[in-house]
């Protein structure tokens, strides 16, 4: 989901980055632990629940770090934050924000869950004007390395 009305770049971004608090050793350790001991093993084990929880924990912690720069929110866009919050309260998802946003994301275990969530969002008038939803699928295959002919 992307809020076309909220952008964070240029001088505003530079000022915000300069004003961020230092990341504490505790938060840094938590980010490493979630990544190395939860997210990566969950990917290997195809354990959606652990993957989603770890990803969301990482995103929430990063949102705390950027909280003051984002007007007291873990999301730069209140509209995106509202959608993600509603989804997280009602569905098992992995969620977060890309960089400063305004793009947020929600990862679902199945297409059926996604369809239920889309119906829920429409039925409960959670979506606002200026918010665009894009639905994509995971590649579900490993990386590929190519040797350049250069």
Predicted feature locations:
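Short, structured patches in soluble enzyme cores that scaffold and shape functional sites
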Residues: 1-4, 137
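C-terminal domain-closing interface element
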Residues: 1, 15-16, 146-150
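Generic low-polarity alpha-helical segments
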Residues: 2, 8-9, 83
């Amino acid at each position: 989901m992307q809020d076309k009305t909220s952008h964070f770049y240029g001088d505003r971004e530079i000022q915000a980055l300069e004003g961020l608090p230092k990341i504490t050793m505790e938060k840094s350790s938590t980010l490493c632990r979630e990544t190395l001991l939860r997210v990566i093993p969950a990917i290997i084990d195809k354990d959606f629940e652990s993957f989603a929880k770890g990803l969301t924990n990482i995103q929430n912690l990063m949102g705390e770090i950027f909280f003051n720069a984002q007007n007291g929110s873990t999301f730069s866009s209140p509209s995106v934050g509202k959608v993600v919050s509603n989804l997280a309260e009602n569905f098992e998802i992995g969620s977060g924000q890309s960089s400063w946003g305004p793009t947020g994301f929600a990862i679902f275990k199945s297409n059926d869950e996604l369809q239920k969530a889309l119906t829920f969002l429409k039925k409960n008038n959670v979506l606002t004007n200026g918010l665009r939803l894009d639905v994509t699928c995971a590649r579900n295959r490993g990386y590929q390395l190519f040797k350049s002919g250069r």
